[in-house]
């Protein structure tokens, strides 16, 4: 076949063109993303019961839902959060669970639980599929100098959200910063008592004023008429004249006993954009959608959307991920170009021929571009990890070309013609190429069998790299020999390499031969050195600070203001504004948007901070956070937490402000509160941690109404009536629905806030008894002050408290978790108090447990494949003996660069396994051939093989090293994710380049002698 290809050079060139064109077409179709799509199958269930306390929501709504949902197959984690009037249950499924099938099971479970839920719920629980690991791709702000926030929210919900959701690639559009408009009825309790109106009667009057149902039609022989009544009241003015009752010939209207205003459903919610009030829309993408194209489509639609807005409404883009992604990918492309250029430079310097350098110059782009076609077929995207695979592949795919090219060049230098040299050269190294390719491929194919997050995260990297390597094998066997036969010339005709470089390499070659001969005479000492290197590997790995993923500088910060749970919404607003003004003072900040109250809790606020592009600011995201922390003024009752938003966020169940979270669980709620406070206080004292924030253990003030049930029964008052009156008075109860062609709105009933500033208002609340008489609440009850949780959390079916935390500067996640374990041991936490890591920390812990098994599995897989190829149990051990030196180099380089051992560094270690094995395969394969063909002794064969293979070994190592060097030196956006990979490869190759040139021949000889001894022993026994 090779001979036939050599006689068909045009076919080979057209094959290269076909591969390149196929890849180029696929490249234009690939989606763009910062990281591979890692979908955590997650479903969020929401239920509402306006006015219900958090504890009531947890026991009457969350608990029945959890019992039903917890029985669904494939649920890996279940947590719930209950606050005033709302419950949120988060279900996380196993990574291999089909989300659509899970959604059907969730709907069935909700239907099964409906009979156990309270009857007063305004609607059935709803669910939606979410991907909590995915950051929003875009955010818009709606603001107006004249319109209230509720009207802006209405525009966003009824117009913008609908239109945006129709754009291809848009997943979910979420609104925050206010709520839908509502007619708010704020009742004067004194007027109620004066006119003798009961709250339940008032509620019924309001509900009866807004009927909406079929009213029929009239028919005659020739005509038909629809029967209709005037429409529903729409505004506060329409409700002011509502007749509540007639008394003693007088008409009592709503305006006489209540203030009626055009308001919002939830007055404890607000939003902002920089200095102005605003409603914020955050947009996420659909799984697999091209972020760049989706954002471009949104930007293209914005002029039309702005035209739909009133003239006094501004629609502003405040968050756009595309510039950062463009910059990151641009830096990755530059890094790829530098890597290719450096690799070609290595070939030219060693072979000294422009023609020779041109051959891998063709092979590299053919292999890399053709890989895009494989990426497209697998549904991959252009992202940091897949581009890192291509950057590394630039140094690996050239290895095969170098081996073929160097061997053909060697035969040319011996006097063979180009065609004969090409044929003999490729035949000699054909098996070597297959062994090198399979050895490297099996490393990354092994990762695909690990499952879990590691497999999902590195699937694109692994398959992309394996595809490039396999294509490289085809190109090296089918195309490179043909190009060599046409382009290469004997040394007399070719442009020779610079004489100085030739002389230097000749001296190196001579020195290596002499030193190798001396080392072969001290085999035991070299084997002891190798054993020491193995031990040093284990020590350095155990001591290396370990982390999950490198912290990225995305230019997006998240801030969280945690207020004292006893503070009201109005009290917290100026405190939150202090932090907002602080953020806006920093020159690197471009925009800040956020929400106050709402589902976050009355006293809390979330900030989304957008920094200027990296080219326009001097500080990194971490330095901006350090400045904000250092300059944050003391705010009584307020805490400000900050962290850098990441492209990949592991889902947690508590919505903590820190980067990581610890869940504390118990069935005994008082014990849970006691121990969660002790644990969180202990964590605050750990110097390795910062921003420790406990969620769920704080208490807000409560008025506890103690009802004398016997007295209430004597007075003809039942508990249902009491609960209804209290709900009507204090819970922002939605008592009627207003139907509109565009949306549905509510009428909200409550006591006037002017009368609810003191618990004494309870003495003026009246309840209607069974006989129609009005009975003061104080006639059968007393009240006292107490404490209650502002939010109630469950993890699984247990009450839980979440403690969020971040790491101090220079502290790895492993060190932080070890410090927490030590603190827990000192506290002697009892067995009935359970703890569990969540979010990034949980994923890190799982990956850390899997790492040794993953490394062992890769080594076993390599051993088996090499054993099959070489038909020997010993030669694979020789090849594997090269790995310890690479590991030592990688771990030392990480330590010197002060980089933690993260999953990206682990990926670099796997790459090193494949690269350094190539060196041993080149040497051993040639030595075995010399033993078979020329009958040389093992010592002579390995010495000669090492001398003859020195040039390709050095070339392939330098190609890999220089190909990874741009990863180390890159300073642009996204470099913090690529640098650990580059440092690992460069450090490992620098050490292994030197050591393996000596240890491989020694191990080969030792194992060959062992083989001969065993063979002799068997012969004697036979």
Where are these regions (language model features)?
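Membrane-proximal extracytoplasmic
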Residues: 1-341, 382, 456, 638-639, ...
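Transmembrane helices with small-residue packing motifs
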Residues: 10, 18-53, 111-121, 376, ...
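Interfacial segments of transmembrane alpha-helices in multi-pass membrane proteins
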Residues: 3-9, 287-290, 326-383, 445, ...
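Juxtamembrane segments of multi-pass membrane proteins
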Residues: 530-631, 635, 657-658, 679, ...
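C-terminal transmembrane helical bundles of large multi-pass transporters
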Residues: 266, 321, 387, 631-1010
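Signature of alpha-helical transmembrane segments and their immediate interfacial
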Residues: 1-31, 429, 497-549, 638, ...
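Transmembrane alpha-helices and their membrane-interface boundaries in multi-pass membrane transporters
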Residues: 2, 394-408, 430-449, 456-498, ...
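Cytosolic juxtamembrane regions of multi-pass inner-membrane proteins
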Residues: 308, 325-334, 350-352, 380, ...
């Amino acid at each position: 076949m090779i001979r036939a290809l050599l006689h068909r050079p045009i076919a080979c060139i057209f094959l290269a063109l076909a591969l390149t064109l196929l890849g180029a077409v696929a490249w234009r179709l690939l989606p763009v993303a910062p990281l591979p799509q890692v979908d955590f199958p997650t479903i969020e269930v929401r239920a509402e019961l306006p006015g219900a306390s958090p504890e009531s929501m947890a026991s009457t709504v969350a608990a029945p839902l959890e019992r039903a949902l917890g029985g669904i197959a494939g649920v890996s984690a279940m947590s719930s959060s209950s606050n005033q009037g709302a419950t949120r249950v988060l279900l996380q499924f196993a990574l291999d669970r089909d989300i659509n099938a899970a959604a059907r099971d969730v709907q069935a479970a909700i239907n099964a639980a409906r009979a156990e839920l309270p009857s007063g719920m305004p609607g059935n629980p709803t669910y939606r599929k979410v991907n909590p690991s995915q950051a929003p791709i875009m955010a818009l702000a709606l603001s107006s100098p004249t319109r209230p926030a509720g009207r802006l929210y209405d525009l966003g919900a009824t117009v913008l959200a609908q239109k945006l959701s129709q754009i291809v690639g848009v997943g979910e559009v979420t609104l925050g910063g206010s709520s839908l408009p509502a007619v708010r009825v704020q009742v004067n309790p004194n007027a109620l008592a004066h006119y003798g109106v009961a709250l339940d009667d008032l509620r019924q009057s309001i509900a009866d004023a807004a009927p909406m149902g079929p009213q029929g039609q009239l028919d005659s022989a020739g005509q038909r008429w629809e029967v209709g009544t005037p429409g529903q009241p729409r505004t506060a003015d329409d409700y002011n004249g509502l007749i509540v009752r007639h008394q003693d010939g007088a008409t009592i209207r709503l305006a006489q006993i209540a203030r009626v205003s055009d308001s919002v459903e939830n007055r404890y919610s607000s939003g902002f954009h920089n200095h102005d009030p605003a409603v914020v829309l955050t947009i996420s993408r659909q799984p697999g959608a091209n972020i760049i194209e989706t954002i471009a489509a949104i930007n293209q639609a914005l002029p039309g959307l702005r035209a739909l807005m009133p003239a006094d409404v501004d629609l502003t883009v405040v968050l756009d991920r595309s510039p950062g992604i463009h910059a990151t990918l641009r830096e990755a492309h530059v890094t790829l170009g530098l890597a290719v250029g450096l690799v070609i430079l290595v070939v030219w310097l060693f072979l000294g021929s422009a023609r020779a350098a041109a051959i891998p110059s063709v092979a590299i782009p053919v292999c890399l571009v053709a890989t895009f076609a494989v990426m497209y077929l697998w549904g991959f995207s252009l992202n940091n990890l897949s581009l890192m695979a291509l950057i590394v592949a630039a140094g690996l795919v050239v290895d095969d070309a170098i081996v073929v090219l160097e061997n053909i060049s060697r035969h040319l230098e011996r006097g063979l013609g180009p065609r004969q040299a090409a044929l003999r050269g490729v035949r000699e190294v054909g098996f070597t190429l297959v062994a090198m390719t399979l050895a490297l491929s099996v490393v990354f194919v092994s990762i695909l069998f690990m499952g879990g997050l590691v497999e999902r995260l590195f699937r694109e990297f692994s398959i992309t790299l394996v595809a490039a390597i396999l294509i490289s094998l085809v190109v090296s066997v089918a195309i490179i020999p043909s190009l060599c036969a046409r382009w290469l010339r004997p040394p007399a005709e070719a442009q020779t390499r610079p004489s100085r470089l030739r002389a230097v390499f000749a001296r190196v070659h001579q020195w290596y031969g002499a030193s190798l001969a001396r080392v072969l005479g001290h085999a035991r000492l070299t084997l002891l050195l190798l054993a020491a290197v193995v031990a040093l590997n284990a020590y350095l790995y155990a001591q290396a600070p370990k982390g999950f993923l490198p912290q990225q500088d995305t230019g997006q910060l998240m801030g969280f203001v945690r207020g004292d749970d006893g503070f009201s919404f109005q009290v917290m607003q100026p405190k939150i504004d202090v932090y907002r003004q602080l953020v806006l003072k920093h020159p690197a900040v471009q925009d800040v948007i956020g929400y106050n109250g709402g589902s976050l809790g009355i006293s809390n606020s979330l900030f989304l901070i957008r920094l200027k592009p990296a080219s326009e600011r001097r500080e990194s995201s971490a330095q901006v956070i350090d400045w904000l922390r250092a300059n944050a003024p003391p705010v009584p009752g307020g805490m400000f937490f900050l962290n850098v938003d990441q492209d990949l966020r592991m889902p947690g169940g508590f919505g903590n402000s820190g980067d990581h979270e610890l869940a504390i669980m118990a069935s005994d709620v008082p014990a849970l509160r006691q121990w969660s406070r002790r644990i969180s206080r202990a964590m605050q004292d750990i110097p390795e941690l910062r921003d420790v924030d406990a969620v769920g253990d704080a208490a807000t003030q409560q008025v506890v109404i103690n009802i004398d049930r016997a007295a209430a029964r004597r007075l003809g008052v039942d508990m249902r009536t009491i609960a209804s009156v209290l709900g009507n008075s204090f819970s922002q109860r939605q008592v009627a629905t207003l139907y509109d062609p565009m949306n549905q709105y509510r009428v909200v009933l409550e006591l006037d806030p002017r009368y609810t500033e003191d618990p004494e208002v309870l003495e003026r609340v009246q309840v209607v008894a069974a006989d129609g008489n009005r009975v003061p609440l104080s006639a059968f009850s007393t009240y006292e002050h107490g404490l209650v949780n502002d939010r109630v959390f469950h993890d699984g079916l247990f009450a839980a408290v979440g403690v969020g935390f971040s790491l101090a500067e220079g502290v790895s996640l492993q060190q932080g978790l070890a410090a927490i374990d030590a603190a827990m041991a000192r506290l002697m936490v009892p067995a009935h108090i359970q703890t569990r890591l969540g979010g990034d920390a949980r994923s890190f812990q799982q990956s850390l447990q899997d790492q040794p098994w993953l490394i062992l599995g890769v080594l076993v897989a390599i051993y088996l494949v090499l054993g099959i190829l070489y038909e020997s149990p010993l030669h694979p051990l020789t090849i594997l003996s090269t790995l310890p030196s690479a590991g030592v180099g990688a771990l030392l380089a990480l330590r010197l660069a002060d980089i933690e051992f993260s999953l990206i560094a682990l990926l670099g270690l796997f790459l090193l396994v494949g690269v350094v094995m190539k060196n041993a395969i080149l040497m051993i394969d040639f030595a075995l051939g010399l033993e078979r063909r020329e009958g040389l002794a093992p010592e002579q064969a390995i010495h000669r093989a090492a001398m003859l293979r020195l040039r390709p070994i050095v070339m392939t190592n330098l190609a890999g090293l220089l190909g990874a060097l741009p990863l180390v030196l890159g300073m642009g956006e996204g470099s913090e994710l690529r640098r650990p990979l580059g440092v690992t490869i460069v450090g490992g190759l620098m050490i292994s380049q030197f050591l393996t040139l000596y240890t491989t021949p020694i191990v080969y000889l030792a194992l060959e002698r062992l083989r001969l001894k065993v063979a002799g022993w068997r012969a004697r026994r036979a």
